[in-house]
Amino acid sequence: MSYKTASKEVKDMLVPLSWLKEYVDIDVEAKELEEKLFSCGFEVEESYEVGKDISGVVVGLVEECEPIPETHLHVCKVNVGGAEPLQICCGADNVHAGGKYPVALEGAQVYATAKDHVTIEGTMKIKKGKLRGYESCGMLCSGTELGLTEDLYPGAGYNGLLVLPEDAEIGADVKPLLQLDDWIFDIAITANRPDCESIFGIAREVAAILNKPVKTPALDYTESGVTKDGFTVTVDAPDLCPRYIAHYVTDVKIGESPAWMKRRLALVGIGSISNVVDITNYILKELGQPMHAFDSSYIEGNAIHVRRAHDKEKIVTLDEKEFELNENNLVICDGVKPVALAGIMGGLNSEIRDTTEAVIFESAKFARDNIRKSSRALGQSSDSSQRYAKGVDEYATVMASKRALHLIEELGCGKVSSTHVEANTGNSIEPTEMKASIKKVNGVLGIEVPTADIERILKSLNFQPVINGDELTIQVPAYREDMESYPDIAEEVIRMYGYDHVTPTFLKAAAVTSGGMNTKQKTELKIKRALCAQGAFEGVHYSFFSPSDLNLLGLPEDAPERHAIRLINPINEDLSLMRTTLAPQMIHAIARNQKNGCLEGRVYEIGNKFIPKDLPLTEYPDERETICIGIWGKEENFFTLKGLVDTVAETLFIDFEYVEDKKTFLHPYRTAKILYNGEEIGYLGQLTYEIQKEEDMRESAYVAEIDLKALRPVYGKVPTFTPISKFAKETRDLALVMNKSVTCGEVEKAIAEASSFVESVELFDVYEGLQVGPEKKSMAFTVTFAPKEEEFTTEAVDGYVKKILKNLNNKLGVELRS
């Protein structure tokens, strides 16, 4: 269980090369080792030298040191191993003749610090210069200027020059001396390999890669402490705690950890707290096993109980947060009260203090699912809970307990008692047997790996192989919980044998299947390119959303969008439903952009929404491919969004119709539904002011959603070519009077239907007032007629206009304005 460590955020696992070398004899360079790890299935996201930003710094001896009058500066003669000493001006108060310090030579690179001499502000190059008239040919350095902290090197935290050992060789590079030449590997560990979430776990793999033996960390100790008579451990929830080990340590002396331990913890992102606490954090990184130390004086009843929490039972954890628990949470209790939230964090009431004299060390295996769910439900995460959630093996639990006791003895901070209790130890830490055939293993790989190589590889991975003809028997260590069947054996063989041995071949299907995109992919690409040409960016969101997203839209309970599929095991409640609309995520995206200072923009997403045919599910849902478009900004409006929707239609060589509509989340007078061939396929409109306010939007926003699956029949449609007429076009302006309920779209449609010679209809004026009467309005249109085979006559065009007016009157009650 994690203490309040001063740890920085680490996205993967940091592995110092120097720590690895304690367990494996590594005789290759760091970069070569990185390549070997990568070729064996480990993603090394980054590798770097600890002192990568430091160069040109050597050991210097100050031979003379004289103060510069009326300043805090000193002028020094510094021997750096050259023919003549260098003259360097220095303002540190701990500089003196006879002292050895790091010297940055001319052209060297070190870290630049702020006025507090602690905060790093980038790097700087050292140049020759003058201070108060004195030439200065270099710089004497502090620990901070070399990127060091007190945990990385003793004395580096002092606000002055870093004092080097008296036996440091003058003129030598300081990197090896200060261990700045160490390397760090930042390794991403996949979910199926929790055994590699530790330095020793990686060391086992490196040993196999280099075909070297791996050295086990020292586990021996002597039981010399006072016994704790009558101490018991009981596990009332064996399904949640397969193994629990408690060991009593007396004569504890809380103090600082040795420099080597503080340095190693610092290299993996953990700050030193005290020797006992550091031991638990050290083992977490070294062996991958979370541990906890209780102050024995606060454990009442001389007992430890592992049980489910009582409903509404409370505990205050080490970070001083109080939690109300339920029976889904596992707790560690003494005879009276909870003293830890199992696998997540210790209790404040039993923490290690400066006055602690006796400690109970805990090493346990907790059910990963329970720890993961408890951590998520309580909103409480720690290094330990994250580790338990990935899985901890029985072997590490036993090994870590012994390692902690060895370190207690090695650091001289306590005496190990013979009081040692293991509970619920029914699960074996011995290897389990697995059988396979060499033929099957090679069949999975598609190549013939020599039997001798298979045996060598499996032996190096500690599988203890026995081969009898074609039969292969291995012993799977307790820490390899990922090994289930012969394909797993094949994977282990090929990653060590080398993927480069596999000859690339085409799939058999590739011989008869032509490459390239299908019609659907080509059409979608055209739509994307067309929208990008209009200044829109593509967005991608999860296929899941939150129940609160449906509330954001203000949808009624019987709305189809509310009939969403709930996931059995969601990542979290915000991603618990399969989305039935793309609008909420687009709204959130618009809000995020505005909050981040992007006050105008256009975004689209092409993705699936999932419409269940019935709930609970009895058959697969209908996956509707959909495009959602969102725009926002001062220059955007309903019509610019309509233009983008029309762009989609134009790309497909079709026309959309727009009819006034109402939606709970869109402006009541700036909303339309989109029709194709009379069927509704989407909508567009402005978000309501309530939603814009709730999402903290500063600019108006508009969204559209179109069902692309409904348009699949027109994918790949080839447009027909109509030759440009060689005859002159004719136009007529029509001022029409109609009821206010008649829409522009209805009028345009009726005009176009009346004559095949109508090429276009454009609205140019709208009037409401006394001249047309109440409940009436006037709209004026320019109608363009295009001849096909001969010139128009005035009489012919007048005839078309009469047909138009008749059709308008019959269908919409529209009349020509007098």
What are these regions (language model features)?
Residues 51-55, 221-224, 511-512, 516, ...:
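Beta-rich nucleic-acid/ligand-interaction surfaces
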Residues 210-235, 412-441:
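Terminal amphipathic helices with adjacent charged low-complexity linkers/tails
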Residues 59-88, 267, 274, 280-349:
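Conserved mixed alpha/beta core segments that line enzyme active sites in large multi-domain catalysts
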Residues 35, 460-466, 482, 613-617, ...:
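A carboxyl-terminal module marker
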Residues 6-223, 227, 360, 383, ...:
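Phosphate-backbone binding interfaces of nucleic-acid-interacting proteins
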Residues 17, 35, 67-69, 210, ...:
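Glycine/proline-enriched, intrinsically flexible loops and inter-domain linkers
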Residues 132-141, 145-147, 156-160, 175, ...:
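Mobile "lid/hinge" segments at catalytic clefts and subdomain interfaces of large enzymes
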Residues 434-599, 732, 784-786, 796-818:
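Extended, well-folded interaction surfaces typified by the phenylalanyl-tRNA synthetase beta subunit core
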